[in-house]
Amino acid sequence: IMEDEMDNAQLAQLLFPDVDKTPEYYEEKFPYRKLPSKAQVTRMAPSPTGFIHLGNLYSALADERIAHRNGGVFYLRIEDTDEKRKVDGAVETIINVLRYFDIEFDEGAGFPDDAPQNAYGPYFQRQRVEIYHAYAKSLVERGLAYPCFCTEEELEKVRLEQEADKVLTGYYGKYAHCRDLSFDEIKRRIDAGETYVLRLRSQGSPDKEITFVDSIMGEIKLPENIHDIVLLKRDGVPTYHFAHAIDDHLMRTTTVIRGGGWLASVPTHYELFHVLGFKMPAYGHTAHLMKFDEETGGK
């Protein structure tokens, strides 16, 4: 075990030589909010596409009411990790559209950075990369994350093999080829200039279930996550799942209302919150409002 721990520490240093802050630093920097006992902290976290689905609007309306009925906070966070979908002026559009419906934010994107209420920022994910890296480094140190060098072609080959065998597709168990690479092998490949993503070393089991209480639907049972999901892409930018878990935690979000399409992500989020040592916010999933909203119905 000692040797593993040493390897993990070395690996963390190899992957994140410039990360000098720890999760503890951020936990202190963003303490729990001093709010009345029943107050809820909610958020709207759209991608900056400049287009608001009805589903987003519906969730925002619910979130704003929940936050403001007991002296809570409703903030705007921008999920801009996907550069391809970014549209100039999108943030202003979002704020103006919501203002048209009398939905006002208390803090977040759209307020000046030095505004006193913006103590939990930055509120754009691209400006928070060093925070995600601190948590990623900590997961590597604890043996809960690892670099994966598999190419798109290799992943595609595995997927076809899984489909032929009629098993669940994805990167898990015996199909997770990079899961058990030695430190020396990893170092050799990085030195050779190979690029990699960072994956979660999932602790989930295919025959176990999680039980969680949905604020809207009540108790729900779902299979545990078993996938070694990607946490950081090749360019070091986090995936939506990883970023939002850290953001919801550090911004001290208590309640998330989102479209029913996100229900399938709960096992992933459940495991992420667990390995990161975070308390999960209360999730409420709404039924689909409209067919065309299914894809992105308000995250």
Could you say what each language-model-derived stretch is?
Residues S138, R142, Y146-K299:
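Active-site cores that bind ATP or allylic diphosphates and position pyrophosphate for catalysis
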Residues E3-A164, D235, A264-A282:
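N-terminal Rossmann-like or analogous alpha/beta NTP/dinucleotide-binding catalytic cores
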